[in-house]
Curated annotation (Swiss-Prot):
It comes from the Bacteria. Associates with the 50S ribosomal subunit. Belongs to the TRAFAC class TrmE-Era-EngA-EngB-Septin-like GTPase superfamily. EngA (Der) GTPase family. This is GTPase Der. HAMAP family: GTPase_Der. The keyword Repeat applies. SUPFAM superfamilies: P-loop containing nucleoside triphosphate hydrolases. PANTHER family: GTPASE DER.
Length: 492
């Protein structure tokens, strides 16, 4: 496995800027406001030929109470404990501050390997701050500029001996979606007339799950309960998680990567620039996930923003699980559950049959049901149906309810096959596909859900005409050139 590097330092010394440079993507929020990064955040970093995990920590604040700064400080200490190496950043232009000295002492006690770096050291104005850094007792500081990429060669030299102690870890990739089925594999599968097994999550390719919802729905509390440790910031302040945090866990024997996203508010309420960045981060987490857990607040479920989040996940083609949190404080549970199911079917018909489970992130009740629902949704998302079974089913559907004949043109549905998985995608060859009403499409999709046990997952149904394979269909004939017109004119 690769080593882990934690970037630590007081607020606004350039930790997130360096994190983004190492990761190669804008994965951490960057702003001039101190304390922008409020959670521990992991990414796969590249530095030359080195590959390692980097943690962007909350800014070290000299606070010990239960304030947000105090919790940030405790999380940073947790990052130091998790890491193999700590990169301690100071601001060379500001020089060594009393806060830097306090936390240099903490790092000496808690971390076996500390690399000291004087960031923002471009130009002669930083020389005095670099010299002051020697007084911290952490060795010779590296002169760096995370913004301009200076000092990375020196950082490489420091990390190379560490890297040699660890095996290289293969870079993680985004989950495969809209997987086109191989024709040869399809033939073998169809001959067996069996539903293919769902790919089993592994440590190298864990099941990727995004937990999304409105602010303060309990997303971080839920994940902390699954983890069994206080990894993410939790508290009464709405919108406390501003980044989409990715965590690898083993949940009941299933390797998973879980994304805890920023609470998605209505656009009208997203005033602060940072929160706008976080909402887009949450949308991106949905795209990275295979299964999306939409977490609702039992007291105010299915608000407009909840519906938009669930619809977004469906449009992105992800498996969806609806989880209703704070169930422990509900009094009339049976009546409430009945009302929730009725509202779900009425407000989100496109997710008909998706799992709806009740949980309490505070007490941990219902987590086993949530795990089972995620695994079921993932299984359905990967579902494959034999072509022969599809065409027998199609014949029955046509007999039960023949397609309409718009403008007197009879639509013939001739053949059906599955073209994709993740989510399931089907193709029907027919005449006049452009004339097929949307209501008949829904009839077929709902039938697929019920008859092949595919509740809740997005199902893509494409109608194709007989001539769709003709590459010249719809192309204009080439017009005669001027030379050709001239020659034909001379002949006449």
């Amino acid at each position: 496995m690769s080593f882990t590097l934690a970037i630590v330092g007081r607020p606004n010394v350039g930790k997130s800027t360096l994190f983004n440079r190492l990761v190669g993507k804008k994965l951490a929020l960057v702003d001039d406001q101190p304390g922008v990064t409020r959670d521990l955040r992991e990414g796969e970093a590249r530095l030359g030929d080195l590959r390692f995990t980097v943690i962007d920590s909350a800014g070290l604040e000299d606070a010990t109470d239960n304030s947000l700064e105090g919790r940030m400080r405790r999380l940073t200490e947790r990052a130091v404990e998790m890491a193999d190496v700590c990169l301690f950043l100071i601001d060379a232009r500001a020089g060594v501050t009393p806060t830097d000295e306090v936390f240099a002492e903490i790092l000496r006690k808690k971390s076996a390997h500390v690399i000291l770096a004087a960031n923002k050291s471009e130009g002669s104005a930083a020389d005095a701050g670099v010299l002051e850094a020697y007084g911290l007792g952490l060795g010779e500081p590296i002169r760096m500029s995370g913004e301009h990429g200076e000092g990375l060669n020196d950082l490489y030299s420091e990390l190379l001996p560490v890297s040699e102690k660890f095996e290289k870890l293969a870079e993680e990739t985004a989950p495969e979606t809209d997987v086109v089925l191989d024709e040869d594999e399809n033939e073998a599968f169809n001959a067996g007339e069996e539903i293919a097994a769902t790919p089993v999550p592994t440590l190298e390719k864990p099941l990727q799950v995004a937990v999304v919802g409105r602010p303060n729905a309990g997303k971080s509390t839920l994940i902390n309960k699954i983890l069994g440790e206080d990894r993410l910031l939790t508290g009464p302040e709405a919108g406390i998680t501003r980044d989409a945090i990715s965590l690898k866990i083993d949940w009941s024997g299933t390797p998973m990567r879980i994304f805890d996203t920023a609470g998605m508010r209505k656009k009208a309420k997203v005033q602060e620039k940072l929160e706008k960045l976080s909402v887009s981060d949450g949308l991106r987490a949905v795209k990275f996930a295979e299964v999306v857990v939409v977490l609702l607040d039992a007291a105010i479920p299915f608000e407009q923003q909840d519906l938009r989040i669930a619809d977004l996940a469906e449009r992105e083609g992800r498996a969806v699980v609806i989880a209703v949190n704070k169930w422990d404080i509900e009094d009339e549970k049976q009546e409430k559950l009945k009302a929730l199911k009725e509202a779900f079917e009425r407000l989100l018909p496109q997710l008909r049959g998706a799992p709806l489970v009740t949980v309490s992130a505070k007490t941990g009740r219902g987590l086993d049901r949530l795990h089972a629902a995620i695994m079921k949704a993932h299984d359905v998302w990967n579902r494959r149906v034999p072509t022969a079974a599809l065409n027998r089913w199609l014949a029955g559907m046509l007999e039960q309810h023949p397609p309409p004949a718009p403008q007197g043109k009879r639509i013939k549905l001739r053949y059906m096959t599955q073209a994709k998985t993740r989510p399931p995608g089907f193709v029907v060859m027919c005449s006049h596909p452009d004339k097929m009403p949307a209501s008949y499409n829904r009839y077929l999709v709902n039938g697929l859900r019920e008859d092949f046990d595919m509740p809740g997952t997005p199902i893509r149904l494409t109608l194709r005409g007989q001539g769709d394979k003709n590459p010249y269909k719809g192309k204009k004939k080439s017009t005669p050139s001027r030379l050709r017109k001239h020659l034909e004119g001379r002949k006449s």
